[in-house]
Amino acid sequence: VEGGSGVNDGSFNITVEPNPTIDVRVAIISVTVEDATVSRTVTVIQAPQAGETGDDAWKSKEFYHRSLVLRFTADWCGYCPQMASALNDAQQALPDKIETIAVHGGGSSLQTEASSALAGLYGITNYPTGVIDGLSYVPNNDRTKDLIISSVKETEDKYDAVSGASWTSSVSGRNVNLNLSAYIKEAGSYKITAFLLEDNVIAPQTDYKNGDQPDYAHSGIIRSAFTYPLGESFTVEEDYAVKDFLYSVEVPSGSVVDNMRVIVYVQKLDEDTSRYYVDNAFSAAVGVTQSLQFVTDGWGTGNEGVKPGEDITF
């Protein structure tokens, strides 16, 4: 009020498009008065629609695809840090397109029964070795990064992703609980695998290039298996099915829950080759809800990380 004090009331209307996802969408709106002395932040929450544009929306959408790289490694392996570096470079070249697991074997101090089972499945005898989507084997050399990238692109060129996953995870005492749903578009034979991984595990690592490292930060270490390590088999009789799974595993002594994440991948049987390949892979920190992810509109709200004053998208 000019020349004095008082209160001005104001209002505005927001019109949004229908929510085509199967998740609640959240956006943040910041409102600031002209002289910037007063501001308010409003959170807008939009429920999903029912029917074909709600619960069934996933059927007409294209799943976002990520490849899975199993990096077979060991703490005594002096060449293994080089492959880890090449894999990191490949991830930088293909942002948010590669999920990884560091599969320790060969007597490594970080070896588990699950990692031993994976090494047996893929016949691993040499370290390091990379296996991409269960299809391609990559050795350690000066072309490792390029081979990983080309293998990831080869999977996407050959197969359309027909699986998606969503889940919630929670901690109860020393247990991590996982409530998981797999969304499958095509009838066929499948396997689902879920591991509890730990990042930033400080332990020695032999390194022929940079010298042995007593405090190497190991990431993507398998700590526990929610499922059978080689995958829990299931069959989809008709197109468009949802399979639900419920698991709980104990956090190993000495592990830090804040450094742990859940990784899930779905394998599909290729009827032409009688071989399973990784159709899609996903990961999220323990306690973080994983939503279905689509190519067409991103995933979740489309406004993750939006701060007051930034643009929002509905």
Language model: regions and residue ranges:
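Surface-exposed binding patches on compact interaction domains or structured appendages
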Residues: 1-15
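Short, solvent-exposed loop/linker segments at the N-terminal edge
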Residues: 5-6, 169-174, 303-312
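Short strand-edge motifs at loop-to-beta-strand transitions and within beta-strands
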Residues: 10-14, 241-249, 312
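C-terminal edge beta-strand
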Residues: 36-50
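Short, conserved sequence motifs used for protein processing/export or organelle targeting and
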Residues: 89, 96-293
